[in-house]
Amino acid sequence: MQKGLTIYLNGKPLSGKRVELLLSDNTIPYHTEGRIDSVRYKLIAGLGGIGEPKLSGWYIYCNNRLVLEADTSSITGWGVQPIPKWHINYAMFRGVLFLDSEETLNLPLTTTKKGIDATSEVYKAILPLMKNGMIKVFEFLKKIPQMGDEANDYRAMLWENTPKIGAVELKALNFSNAEKIFVAPPLNTDVIARKKNTVRIAYDVAKQTAETAKEHAEA
């Protein structure tokens, strides 16, 4: 478990995979925090890993209890204008919302305390902030497929070469940049080539020349 704080899911200590976001000088999550009535909130939206799309979505903690995990439903704004429904192109999206109150009854929990009450006035006030964070991150994620064959290499390179931070650390982190701004990493195929120590060269040659080169390579 992440040091200094125990996270619970349905009353049990959570020992599963860490919720991690990329954080570096040129990759900084969207974030905002404040208070609505007696509820304190801290919201972070950014980039996570690839290869496990089921981990994509929103994670909502109420008094350090995880009540919504990897949610991509309308409860967290997905598929509700102007937010699109979840798509594999958004698999790197990670959103984390921390809600804290001295009075548990003031938190936007369902009667079973195992989910989020989307009709709560507190939650309805925060949802637009969540959507704004999604829009900022999606603007970047929508550009990656335009890289064509390099898209997956770029996603992998980001995850492998960018420092990461866990949910607990995020809650305690004092961000140095302004609120409600997502700092996206550079979208540059040359970066991928340098990381791979290779340069991709593509050009057309006559068929006979290509066959001759192939014969020499196989000799």
Describe each PLM feature range.
Residues 25-219:
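Charged regulatory segments coupled to nucleotide-binding catalytic modules in large multidomain enzymes
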Residues 12:
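Flexible loop/N-cap segments at domain edges
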Residues 1-9:
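ATP-binding catalytic core of ATPases
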Residues 15-16, 68:
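Flexible loop/turn segments at secondary-structure boundaries
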Residues 16, 20-21, 73-74:
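A generic structural motif
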